[in-house]
Amino acid sequence: MFSYEMHLHCSEVSKCGTSKAEEFVKSYAELGFAGIVFTDHFIHGNTAISRKLPWEERMHAYFEPYEKAKCYAKELGLDVIICLEHAYGNGKEVLVYGDITPEILAAHPEIEKMNIKDFIGFCHENGWFVAQAHPYRKRDYIDMSVPPIPELVDGIEVYNHFNAAEENVKATQLCEQHDLIAISGSDTHNASVCGNAGVVFNKRITNGKELANALFENNFKLIINGEVV
């Protein structure tokens, strides 16, 4: 069995991150995880990448900070996959998993002005898996009057380690009501808080394409509060 963290933020790419990518690599390797999926904040979120950069340069800048961490991860036998978390307004976000490259993103500057329906359509055209992140999280920056979008996504993050228990319960109910695929992610921003969430596959996942395919297959278990269920 192969455990993967599905939701984390490093300080090089997300302003809210407090640990560097290499620190996460070390922590998850020590915990025995097979891999981690970086889901840092994209263009409309709390990104550390300058919005003043030209589009193509900005897309490449989003990926560059991971290169050193990927080399370190290879030494430790840990898979590192680069995906993203996309904010679409009112504090709402989706997690996107797949073969996401700076070349694909750089070729489509229209992404920046897409509404969420068109953005998810673009993701699906590329074979990417889209999950609603923490759909019932209560924070000052989130407009709770704006409902989730189960009709557009492929899955729901039913367990987020930093959500209240009732928020995760409601997310699970939403997922079941719409017959969507359940995923789990810690949403950690610090390498000292790791291993409490994720998914467990029955095979090694080495890249974004394999990850999206495995998620669509829906043949995996979840890590919830540190336990495989």
Regions found by a protein language model. Give the residues of each.
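An N-terminally biased module of ancient metal coordination in phosphate/nucleic-acid-related enzymes
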Residues: 1-88, 149-151, 169, 190-192, ...
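Conserved beta-strand positions in the central sheet of alpha/beta enzyme cores
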Residues: 36-38, 131-132, 157
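Internal catalytic-core helix/loop-beta-alpha segment
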Residues: 108-142
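Flexible loop residues that form catalytic
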Residues: 41, 135, 161
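Surface-exposed amphipathic alpha-helices with a cationic face
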Residues: 3, 29, 70-74, 117-131, ...
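Charged catalytic cores and adjacent phosphate/nucleic-acid-binding surfaces used
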Residues: 1-14, 20-26, 90-103, 121, ...
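Glycine/small-residue-rich loop that forms an oxyanion/phosphate-binding "nest" at active or ligand-binding sites
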Residues: 82, 103-106
